[in-house]
Amino acid sequence: MRIAVISDTHDRFPPLLPDRLKGADEIWHLGDVCDPMTLEAFAHLGPPLFVVRGNCDVHPGWPESRALEREGVNFLLTHVPTSRVPPGFAAVLHGHTHVPRDEEINGVRWLNPAASHGRAARARRLRG
């Protein structure tokens, strides 16, 4: 399974993003979408879209965090990195800082794809 992880789009849908997301089975947006209408562009790409609410988001229907299990691996999606991780999660995916992150702390992998626009633009493939 290929999962495209993005964050901090801040009302933007970068023109190169569709090519970077091509082939993804799912798209996980880690918050700061800002205008919910921006998600329509992501929804038209086809794969299921999962989103969490960021500090710049006001949409009441988006959760602050989301637990997902894929291929036996438990992921915690959130915007602002949490100080405590509930037991059972192999990875915490977050945005907010606009700084790429890929590190392991106490057996938990911490990932941040960074902002999805400007020089920090990136979409990363995550494998379980």
Which residues make up each language-model segment?
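N-terminal active-site segment of His-dependent metallophosphoesterases
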Residues: M1-L49, D57-E64, A123-R125
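Binuclear metal-dependent phosphoesterase catalytic core
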Residues: R2, E71, E104-N106, L111-G128
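Active-site neighborhood of phospho(di)ester-bond hydrolases with catalytic His/Asp-centered motifs
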Residues: V5-S7, E26-D32, F50-N55, L76-H79, ...
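Short acidic/polar capping segments at secondary-structure boundaries
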Residues: D11, T97-V99, A115-G118
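Binuclear metal-dependent hydrolase catalytic cores centered on His/Asp/Glu-rich metal-binding motifs
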Residues: R12-P15, P36-M37, E71-V73, T78-F89, ...
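Helix-adjacent hinge/juxtasegments
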Residues: P48-P87
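Residue-level detector of beta-strand structural context in well-folded domains
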Residues: E64-R66, P100-R101, R127-G128
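Non-DNA-binding regulatory cores of transcription-related proteins
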Residues: P86-I105
